[in-house]
Amino acid sequence: MDPDFLALRRVLLVDDCAPVRASIKGMLQQIGFKLIYQAKDAVEAISICEQHALDFILCDFNLGDCQDGYQLFETLKSRQLLHSMCCFVIISAESQRQIVHGVIELQPDDYILKPFTFPVLKERMVKVMKEKMALRKIFQASQGGDLAEACRQADVIIRQQNEVQLQAERLKGELLLQAGNYQQAETYYQQLVNQRKPVWSKLGLAISILQQQRFDEAEQLLTELTEHDETAVESRDYLAHLYFRRGNLKRAFEILQYVTQLSPKNIPRQKTMANLALLCHDFAAAARIFHKIVGLARHSMHDSAQNYLNHARCIIDNANQQAPIDRANALGHVGKLLDSLVKRFSPELIAFDLQILQVRLLCAKGKPAEAKQLLAKYQQLTEQEYHPETCLDAAKAYFETGDIFGCYFYVTQLRKQLNKANFLTDSQRLLLDTEQRRYEALYQQLKQLIQQATDAYQQQEYGKAVLIFSRASKEMPTNPALALSLLQAMTKCTGVSADTLPVARNALSLLQSAPLEQRMQERFKQYQQILSKQYSQLQNTQRG
């Protein structure tokens, strides 16, 4: 390669070991590079990338205790700090399957195992740069958003039948899939498979068939591809999505469990798996996954308060299914988790999330009246766009406190956001649909119970009315009108069951703290006086 060309290329070397950096820098100088930048960690590397348009990045996988090479590459791609012609090569002494699969998934330009010699480094770097130069028009058009032009440039190279023909063929297939031209992609990939091209051609064929919803054919191809190291992760990802789209959520979850063992650093996949656990009503598994995400995302571009909040939300969901003692222990853990959260992230930036979480925490502790009071104090049904998980949690909080309007407000807000076409968004959309169906079913059930209780009261079957109003109040413990109806029916009875008394106590607490219209306030005082004489067990509540 022309020495003058190499002398003008900007190279960044990222390694946490100073002697290793010095050794590799010497090799780079021997190759002919003169503009060599060095970074000992990801923070320095990102800073250099922000200041300079680099042509080549040589990055160690293990960068110490902070962000590693995988996370750095992910960050640079996400922030668009790598221009279309920049070559990114990972170097590592690690050959573990987890690391190799993770690197394959991110698709750097090359991966070099340590230790390596000067001739090996030179050969690999020159090869990567030549390929990048030969394919530059494809990359430039693609990065500019002109997929059709990128395909045309790929065809030009394919017709030339030179040393980068295979790479151009692969890029063309990926461009067809990216553009959503699935029938054309299927025809193209089938031709490549018939020509015995590498295994990626068969994966492209499977994806194009899957996107046309021919699930049986796609399943067969994807299952075969799981046997190849190169496609072990991606084929299983698509296989899990296939089962998800078929409605087999348990099988999709099992496949993602295996994939996350192969390549654990992919945070969107971990979140998708947690969502599948929630859809399978395995709240304990979802909590474990979100706990794992908190650790895995640390130092990465995915590190956020939402990871901690999602963990806390899952603990509350799981606690609602547990026995009282286990529930108390679990909810105590939520408090500790929130303490850790506010030490790392500004409480002001997540004030609404924390408020909603406190409301749900009070509901889970059996204090719905306090929860409703807290929500009313900070209520803000605004068009502000919150994180998807925040909207779903807000919908749950409003439903649990009996505010159907507030619940559906956040359901609508969330639905507007779920417009991407990927596995994670699909799982979020199904979670929302499932929650909405649950709300609608409970709401219809409550309407029926209230009607049955009202009919019983009008027919002077007061004992029956109390039982049904009590059942309805357990489902909607923060509805003042329902609480008042229960107390009214109780004034007509000579006695109620032991199961009804806790519900009645909650009704009294709710009505004592809730802002009531004058007519409702007068009725409440009237019922209080009657009940204090009839039921001595309620007197402490009334004085409180």
Regions found by a protein language model. Give the residues of each.
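Conserved acidic segment of CheY-like receiver
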Residues: 7-19, 24-28
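Conserved phosphotransfer microenvironments
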Residues: 59-76, 84, 393, 496, ...
